[in-house]
């Protein structure tokens, strides 16, 4: 196994988007403008409905892929291709915008906690004018690797015998939701062709190696 060094540690920047949704932005700021192929990474989450109730009314995208992963709460998606979807805890929405799409993401709740992530991925130039596509992945489709000290939900890529449902994309993405017991280790052979990041949702992390970018997020 080849170790790779941690190149940067970044604290997310407080921001807002859509119709006043409060969030924490890690990529797409003055600290990290771009981490190829990642254009933006946002964490949205609050128990105060005023922080999210405005949602993300209809707006355009072009030439990127957006990946939304819900931890709790519910969002409704609707776009100009006619696709609709309702996301709940554990669900993933993967959207290829290609030549252009208009979509909205609105909370399907008026109280309670809403928490999730959205990642923007740059599309290669030769795919930027492709037909847009919306992919909804139910939490039940996710395979999970479990052992005595860790639980790994595989959204994309493969860990052990668990393989993610996200396939057929411009790169071979690897996207894990990892839960570790205290003072335990997580080891993974990352392809040399990939840039990477780790986002810490809770607790702290010690590392001896490298990940090309780590974000409180470790980039």
What is the meaning of each model-derived region?
Residues 1-25:
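Hydrophobic alpha-helical membrane-insertion signals
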């Amino acid at each position: 196994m080849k170790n790779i060094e941690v190149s940067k540690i970044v604290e997310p920047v407080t921001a807002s988007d859509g119709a006043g949704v409060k969030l924490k932005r890690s990529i797409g700021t003055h600290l990290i403008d771009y981490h190829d192929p990642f254009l933006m990474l946002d964490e949205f989450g609050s128990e105060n409905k005023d922080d999210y109730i405005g949602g993300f009314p209809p707006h355009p995208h072009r030439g990127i892929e957006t990946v939304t992963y819900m931890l709790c709460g519910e969002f409704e998606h609707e776009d100009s291709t006619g696709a609709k979807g309702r996301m709940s805890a554990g669900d993933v929405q993967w959207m290829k915008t290609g030549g252009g799409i208009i979509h909205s993401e609105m909370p399907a709740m008026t109280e309670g906690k809403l928490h999730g992530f959205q990642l923007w991925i740059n599309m290669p130039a030769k795919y930027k004018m492709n037909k847009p596509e919306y992919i909804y992945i139910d939490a039940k489709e996710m395979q999970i690797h479990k052992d005595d000290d860790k639980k790994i939900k595989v959204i994309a890529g493969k860990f052990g015998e668990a393989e993610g449902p996200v396939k057929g994309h411009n790169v071979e993405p690897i996207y894990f939701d990892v839960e570790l017991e205290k003072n335990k280790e997580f080891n993974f052979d990352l392809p040399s062709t990939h840039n990477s990041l780790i986002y810490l949702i809770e607790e702290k992390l010690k590392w001896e190696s490298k990940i090309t970018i780590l974000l409180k997020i470790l980039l």
